[in-house]
């Protein structure tokens, strides 16, 4: 069924279709089942796999527990790349240190960050420097300008301000005035212009 779904998508668009998978489910032997599963879904024509480096436990664990149990198995993902060298393999699961994770690119094609950058999005400003040797640094003032544009565009589209702003507060974790900034951003009494005007006060933007 997974292969059929992927085949239908690849047949209906020129946009590259990818799949995100786990190493297996429940009591499956991932040494036996994983390669077979991938050989089947690759018949759909996809060329890129995002691989979460642990099994999915469908019985006995809730979604939160499934994020940490069972242990991560990066080595199995590395071997997957060895078995399928012509397929782009992107690693996902437990990645939380750019400097350490960079070494994983010797065995793989890419890294997929999830919870880590959702909780600490300001860390993304380090990506170009660490992974691409860029000499440019994104300062917080530039990010505030980008937030202003993003808020205004989404406000014009009618999206909920709360759903947008609740992720923005994480940009300022670790800043001296993070609590004050969080209160400003999440305030129901301030419009977008007022929020941005306050955030542009440089004394607040101290890491």
Predicted segments, located by residue:
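Flavin-dependent oxidoreductase catalytic cores
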Residues: 1-207
């Amino acid at each position: 069924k997974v292969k059929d779904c992927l085949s239908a998508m690849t047949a209906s668009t020129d946009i590259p279709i990818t799949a995100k998978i786990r190493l297996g489910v429940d009591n499956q032997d991932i040494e036996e089942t994983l390669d077979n599963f991938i050989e089947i879904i690759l018949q759909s024509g996809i060329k890129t796999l995002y691989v979460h480096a642990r099994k999915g436990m469908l019985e006995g664990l809730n979604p939160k527990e499934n994020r940490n149990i069972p242990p991560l198995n990066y080595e199995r993902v590395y071997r997957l790349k060895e078995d399928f060298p012509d397929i782009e393999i992107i690693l996902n699961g437990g990645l939380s240190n750019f400097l350490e994770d960079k070494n994983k690119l010797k065995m793989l094609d890419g890294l997929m960050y999830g919870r880590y950058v959702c909780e600490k999005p300001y860390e993304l400003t380090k990506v170009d420097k660490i992974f691409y040797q860029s000499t440019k640094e994104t300062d917080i003032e530039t990010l505030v300008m980008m937030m202003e544009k993003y808020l205004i565009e989404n406000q014009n589209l009618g999206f909920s301000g709360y759903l947008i702003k609740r992720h923005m507060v994480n940009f300022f974790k670790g800043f001296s005035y993070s609590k004050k900034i969080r209160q400003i951003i999440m305030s129901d009494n301030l419009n977008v212009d007022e929020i941005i005007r306050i955030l542009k006060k440089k004394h607040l933007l101290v890491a």
